[in-house]
Amino acid sequence: MINHIATRLPATILSAAVLLLSTFSCNKDEPDGGSSPTPVLTDMQVVQGASTEYLSYPAQSSYEEALRGDNLTLSTTVNVATGTSNAVARWYLIEDIGPDKEIFMEDVGAREGEADYTSSITLTEEQFTELFPSGKFKERHFYCKFAFRSSERDISSTVFTSDTMTISTGLPAELMVLRIDTVNGEEPTCDYVSPPPGNNGAGIRNCTKVPGRLKVSLAGKVLYDSGEYVADQSGMTLKIRGNTSAYSAQKPYKIKLQKKKDLLFRGDEETCKDKEWVLIKGYANLNTLIGLEAVRHLGFSWVPAMQYVNVVVNDDYRGLYCLVESYKRNQKCRVDIEERGFLIEKDAYWWNEDLYFDTSGFPSNMKFTFKYPDPEDIQTEQVLYIQAYVNKAEEEIRNGGDYGKYIDLESFARWILFHDIFATLDCAGSNLYLAKKDMTSNSKLEMLSPWDFDSIYWNGTFTQCWSNQHMYWAFYYPALLSNPNKAFLEKYKAEWNRVRGTIGDHMDRTIGEFVEKYGDAINQSRYLNAMRWGGGFADCNDNLADMRSWLRDRVGFLDSNIPSMK
């Protein structure tokens, strides 16, 4: 058996993509009334089972043109190795509701002995427009049935049915597509809340978790299907996440699977699988990719992995996102802490949490909240322990004491060095995550990977300045960098000397390779994202050029200033 897809689209295609996937299987149905000579499907590609072939097309000049090609032709061929006579092919469109719709039939004709039978269907511009309305993401599913009638017995036939042929308009084949269908089409909701006087930010609460089904595909091939929602067995839940980012029309989301899965498909399922994943809006720039790659080069104990994906919820295209591992305890693939360990955040949004604690060493309008243990599971002794431990660390920092007994100097130095390399603007709500492995003196407070990269580059305005975390007293860094105990300053200088000669080349190579491989697909997706939500977007090559220019300037600035720090 062989399958084939032939297509014809306008030569002017420049900005979005049409993706086709066809698989052909040999599902054999023999009607009642006696047997007939059974056609034997031969594998002309010498592979096991059904073969799969897909094609993707370059970008089109406008979203309108992407969905309104002059025509589209699907063609499939089946090879029959024994004598049959007439063959009739019927093409069907799978309807969302009701029986499948027959849209085309043709008499393929008679053959003698081993022969190929081919049937094609062409969608005219009018049909294409009807099936794929302009301005909307849409998937349509087709299949073809070949009915072969014996040359000797015209009362029975053998039918071969193709697997579904999926045509998805508008989404490039190089990026994964996350398709989420919620139960009864329900959308997740949240309430928007403001901070108490004297505090920062605007947040959300009462976020509903909507059950549903998740399918992940690449180039039309389904890589993962969670199945329909059954609590603790299959499916997933979807909810809105974030703080101020949740106020925009395009929402950030959190996905929670009922069964663990590595949605990034890294080839080590047992190690990398987890239930919790986040979708961060990723259309505006490459900041999340650039930030996480720089963090990885600096050598943090764990760095969230990510991929750019397109997201469709209830047949509605939601845009280009970063699918990212969430911050949580998972000793195999995320934050490696013991059951009696801690994952905490110095949090500007503490007022929107059920449990938090304060410390006395460095008064601020930020307090500590818990990522692990869950507030409903934590015991009073655990809260008192970590509060006392952080208070002691702050006391040592404030007094110029032996703070190295309480904080991990290496991770603390790498954290602020990252922000200084990129001159991060954000100071208060910049996702200050810390971990302590257990409740013993064998572990220290560790700074975890930076997370929020929206304000790196100081928005591209200033190259000759420190990060705000370096300069302002929102956290410990001004005290550590100017401390009479120079242990931290020396570690900070050592970390810069370790990476200063490699950071530029590493970022140039890794981000350059990424843009070469995925840049066109991301640019196409950014265009579709803008069509869906409005706003402008930059070209990935411009993002790459900006990063290269920035790092050249920053290495010079840091080389001129770090050695003289006292």
Which residues make up each language-model segment?
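Internal "kinase-insert"/substrate-recognition segments embedded within catalytic cores
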Residues: 256-262, 272-282, 286, 299-304, ...
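Bacterial Sec-dependent N-terminal signal peptides
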Residues: 18-49, 155, 161-164, 168-171
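Conserved NTP-binding catalytic cores of kinases and kinase-like/nucleotidyltransferase enzymes
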Residues: 169-286, 290
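Middle-to-C-terminal accessory/interaction subdomains
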Residues: 186-188, 202, 234, 244, ...
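Surface-exposed, flexible coil segments in extracellular/virion-facing regions
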Residues: 97-129
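Short, solvent-exposed loop/linker segments at the N-terminal edge
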Residues: 53-70
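Conserved aromatic beta-strand anchor motif in extracellular beta-sandwich/beta-rich domains
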Residues: 90-95
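Solvent-exposed loop segments of extracellular immunoglobulin-like
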Residues: 82-89
